[in-house]
Amino acid sequence: MHKVLTELRDREILKDISNEEKFLSLPKNSGVYVGFDPTADSLHLGNYVQIVNLIRFKKHNWNALAVLGGATGMIGDPSFRSTERVLLSTEELLKNKNKIKSQLESFGLKVFDNYEIYKDISFLDFLKNIGKLINVSYMLAKDSVKDRLAQGLSFTEFSYQIIQGYDFLHLYQNQDIFVQYGGSDQWGNITTGIEMISKVVGDNHKAIAITANLLTDSNGNKFGKSTGGGNLWLDAQKTKPFDMYQFLINQPDSEVEKLLKWLTFLEISEIKDLVNKHNKNPKDRLAQKALAYEVIKDIHGKSAAENCTFLSEMLFNLSLDLSKVTLENMEFAYNQIESFEVEKGVNLVNFLVENKILQSKRLAREFIASKSLKFNYEPIDEDFSVSSNYFEGKYATLHLGKKKILICKVK
């Protein structure tokens, strides 16, 4: 049992544990769970931190369970929020649940929907049998609740911690789940579950709360937001893998070792060696490249990670050997960065101007004069007609100046 705790400490992830002595005495194959509310139709990079840690438990032979918040998602967690969440419609919640369940299962995790606990419990039975297990004064003492009282807190949101707490009791009694794990902002909700368990089972219960430090960026904001402030989604249709790759490869040197420890399964010794090599020549961004590759590989697969690595090189290497680039690389690139379709044989400069890819022929001539208008890395002139000798004639690269590259699909 101690091995997973040692790993969480070595990776500087562990924040709090309610009773370490009790944790170390738990039987083999004990269960641990993390909750994921279906507030959107995809999980995001911030959620991925907890997915990775749940997988760490699984690798250490724990019975790891992802709890899908079909019930809690109907209410919305008020913890440390300044405003009440907008409630989801039944149809939207169902759609979100199905997609998130598939995402969690894609990581090899077992998934349990907490709606199954409550679907046959009447409101009066809930008050009679569950509500009596917790005191209002105990709930009001939670920082996550106190912070909202001044702004107003509905009974709906106030009851969230009762449901999350009862989840823990139910899983403890029915599935031998003795540990609930979550971010440090979940401490109040998790310990509510332990309070309920102690009321039912007694003080000799085995329930443990474990929380992780919140992963933040260099500005102290929650990690996983794009430059524009939006979430970086795990769904490739919502966030392109290459956009996530670029986000990771642009992380500052001051953060990259922490991110390698938190977001990858590389051994600590590997990470230290990698960071030492990186520090000898930081401009090569060796650590950031490893971070981006590992995370994309674990989320989207090895092929996507290799294609992202290629695409990054293509964007920033002005002398790339196209003979080493595959058709699969180009098909991937076409769907990841700015691209367009063009018919074989047409005058390329005219096409670019007519389709507003270049603003004017004057600008085209400036690029041509500086040899920075390139088709498949070769400078072209104003009379060039589209034809690609690479990638089975189906794709080509187009450089507009020194910093912009597009992918052409040749029809």
Curated annotation (Swiss-Prot):
EC number(s) on record? Answer: 6.1.1.1
Q: Name one GO molecular function term.
A: RNA binding
| A family per Pfam | tRNA-synt_1b
S4 RNA-binding domain sequence ranges = 346-410
'KMSKS' region (motif): residue ranges = 222-226
Q: What does this protein do?
A: Catalyzes the attachment of tyrosine to tRNA(Tyr) in a two-step reaction: tyrosine is first activated by ATP to form Tyr-AMP and then transferred to the acceptor end of tRNA(Tyr).
Say which family it is in. Belongs to the class-I aminoacyl-tRNA synthetase family. TyrS type 1 subfamily.
Q: How does it assemble?
A: Homodimer.
List the HAMAP family hit by this protein, alphabetically: Tyr_tRNA_synth_type1 (MF_02006)
Q: What is this protein called?
A: Tyrosine--tRNA ligase
Gene designation per UniProt: tyrS
